[in-house]
Amino acid sequence: MRDLLPNEQTLRDYIQGKILETYRASGFERISTPMLEDMENLDKSDGGDNLNLIFKVLKRGDKLTAALNSGDPKELSDMGLRYDLTLPLSRFYAANKDKLPHPFKVIQTDRVFRAERPQKGRLREFVQCDIDILGDESPNAEVELIDVTTRALLGIGFDGFTVNINDRRILRGMLESMGFAADTLDSVCITFDKMDKIGADGVKAELLEKQLPESAVNALADFIAAGEVTLDAVAARCADPAIADDLKYVLATANAMAAGRYQVAYCPSLVRGQGYYTGMVFEI
């Protein structure tokens, strides 16, 4: 958590204003949700490691006394601070979808909180800026999200960046074909996501530490060691070719729209840690 001096807040306001201007010009509408969420919702979400980083709010009065008497630590809190903006959006949309346009193109820029050890680049309180399109399952929605986001970045002076893209469905299909059980795929994906940080040997070691089938781990390690992991090679192990076709379409279209100002690339190890990511994922 940190304070902002007047000049720092002015810069933040300017950057946020430019980003919102780009998003609104493309038809996105801004919403706001409470910082506090019911613990029942937070705990039932599929937020990966973030579930261990929730700032919990103690119950009050008689409810707290009853919780203390129960001896169950989980009974002490009934609310917590949001750790991202996706869970609040899901709850918001479920409660209000009849009042919203279809598809719903939404902006969120708000503070989120994670109870982790502060370090460079990681704060316990920070601002997230999200855009989402709800109600459009076509690959054109993915293309639009990439296009609008990159235009926002270009508008505040960034260039020469790379948009990495993957689809968790393709990755999961490949992993299942290698012998990993369906109920272990999220765990395997989280480890595979660390490829850039710990390398192929580190990924293999961590998967073995998780006591996953050695034959499946070796199959994945051999696949990686064979050379560059291409989309065609991964897609060949996926049961549904339409998923790979959609990803190829998004890559080709996004590259054409980039017009050389930035790069768009397939990244086979890109997963994102949260389990609620089930389709295409991006990272810039």
What spans do the regions from the language model cover?
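Ser/Thr-centered flexible coil motifs
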Residues: 5, 181, 210-213
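Positively charged, Gly/Ser-enriched RNA/tRNA-binding surfaces
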Residues: 11-26, 37-38, 73-76, 84-159, ...
